[in-house]
């Protein structure tokens, strides 16, 4: 492993999708090599990011999440080859008990300009699904929300792509480094460094 640097402008803890996507975007502002350091106790994609299902969708009840996901889908679309992203869309196929909630999701998708189709009624839903899967047989379906964007990605490959994009911009990704605590200013609670099992790295932001 490369020796832990003594200091950095930004230290990011964790080499999953949150840590590496943050590093990648911050590297557009912090352009000097070594400005940003990512500390990962094992390997990139070793945690939840490496075992997630990989579905990319905008199917959430919270309005703020829908706007965030609409933005995130555009990031996946920016480099599908590198991210191993497959833009096949997303289907929510529901019984009557979910009709009202799914209709609400559709209306809010429409309000932010996120392309989707909402099919209502058992007969129309069956016909719509048979147009996609000619052997469709499910009964009791009264609504179908078809998001035309979204799809799925191979998550470990996606994380490695984020790592590559980050390091290409000068980010240092330090693996096998366990964070043990934080160094704080003498007269404040402001963090001035990150303590690890490999030493202390001074920083401006964590």
Annotate each PLM feature.
Residues 53-132, 141:
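Dinucleotide-binding Rossmann-like beta1-alpha1 core, especially the glycine-rich loop
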Residues 2-5, 85, 200:
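Short, flexible hinge/linker loops that cap or flank conserved catalytic cores
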Residues 34-36, 116-117, 206:
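Hydrophobic anchor at the start of a short beta-strand
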Residues 23, 27, 165:
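Gly/Ala-rich phosphate-binding loop of Rossmann-like dinucleotide-binding domains
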């Amino acid at each position: 492993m490369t020796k832990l640097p003594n200091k950095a402008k930004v230290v990011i803890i964790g080499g999953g999708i949150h840590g590496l996507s943050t590093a990648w975007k911050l590297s557009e502002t912090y352009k000097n090599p070594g400005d940003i350091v990512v500390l990962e106790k094992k390997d990139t994609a070793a945690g939840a990011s490496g075992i997630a299902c990989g579905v990319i969708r905008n199917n959430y009840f919270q309005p703020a999440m829908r706007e965030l996901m609409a933005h995130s889908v555009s990031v996946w679309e920016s480099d599908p080859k590198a991210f191993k992203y497959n833009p096949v869309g997303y289907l929510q196929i529901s019984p009557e008990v979910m009709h009202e909630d799914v209709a609400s999701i559709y209306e809010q998708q429409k309000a932010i300009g996120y392309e989707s189709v909402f099919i209502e009624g058992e007969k129309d839903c069956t016909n719509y699904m048979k147009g996609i899967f000619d052997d469709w047989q499910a009964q009791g379906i009264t609504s179908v929300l078809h998001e035309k964007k979204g799809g799925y990605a191979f998550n470990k490959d996606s994380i490695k792509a984020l790592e590559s994009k980050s390091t290409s911009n000068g980010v240092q990704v330090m693996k096998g480094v366990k964070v043990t605590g934080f160094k704080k200013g003498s007269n404040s609670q402001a963090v001035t460094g990150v303590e690890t099992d490999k030493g202390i790295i001074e920083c401006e932001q964590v």
